[in-house]
Amino acid sequence: MPEGPEVRIMSNFIKKNTEHKLFKKMFDVHKENTEYENPIITDFYVYSQSSGKLLTLSFFNDDNHIDIDFFMGMSGNWCWVPTDEWSNVKFTRFRIDSEDDMSLVLYGGYLGPKYKIGGFDTKRGPDPTKEFDKFKLNIVDNLDKKVFQLPIYEALLNQEYFSGVGNYIRSTILYYLDESPFQKAKDVIIKRPEIIDMCRDIQITSYKLNGGQLKDWKNPNDSNSDDFLKWVFYQKGNHLKDSDNRTFWYDPKWESFRK
């Protein structure tokens, strides 16, 4: 958490506030307010884009261009505040200051956000909400890989194949698919290929319902979450700890299929 829909919401929030604005400085607040000195420190613009759970910000001017990848962890989020008030934001990690005295601030507490200049060296598949054909092909062409021998509830968190799918997205997909989550992933995909479409559609629905405001993450636009909470399958039914010690929620009718 945040998952694909939340990262997309944050990316759009950043675009809304930073588009066409000139920024003066960039700070690594997490490291005692250290100001970045290279390659961009003054007079730059910002462009935001998301792919699955990954958020990439591009900082550029006529002379320089730098990309920074942000992984939001369990609690990462952004806010847009007057520069003279940024220190009121708890657990700040990173900020940029605009020439009109506003600041974009990254914050997050427990298991919070990470970022890296130049990008993380990770294997992440295509985002199903943006590149669905590539997303589908990446799954279908690799069904003999070891990951697809795992139970479907485990395999769905693999970002190399199921980009953007996290804890609540997987439980919601499997609830509405109405199949035992304890079957091998390959078997489920062959039997019910619509699960591939649902990896896209469930994320799009969540995005339209303002994202998963479930615990530590809140929509930066202060949007209502009532409809989302009625729709999502999370903290409902039975649960177990998966191999990564994350809580998976499932329909109680599948309990007898659990090994």
Where are these regions (language model features)?
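C-terminal accessory segment of soluble enzyme catalytic cores
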Residues: 202-259
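Residue-level marker of motif borders
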Residues: 48, 161-162, 240
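Short secondary-structure boundary micro-motifs
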Residues: 30-32, 38-42, 78-81, 117, ...
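Preference for short coil/turn "hinge" residues that link or interrupt alpha-helices
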Residues: 34, 149, 158, 207-210
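Phosphate/anion-contacting hairpin/loop surfaces
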Residues: 64-179, 183-184, 188-197, 244, ...
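Gly/Gly-Pro- and Ser/Thr-rich, intrinsically disordered tail segments characteristic of DNA damage-repair
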Residues: 1-114, 190-193, 198-201, 235-236, ...
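Hydrophobic/aromatic-lined pockets within catalytic cores
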Residues: 15, 19, 161, 174, ...
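Residue-level signal for secondary-structure boundary elements
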Residues: 19-22, 152, 164, 207-211
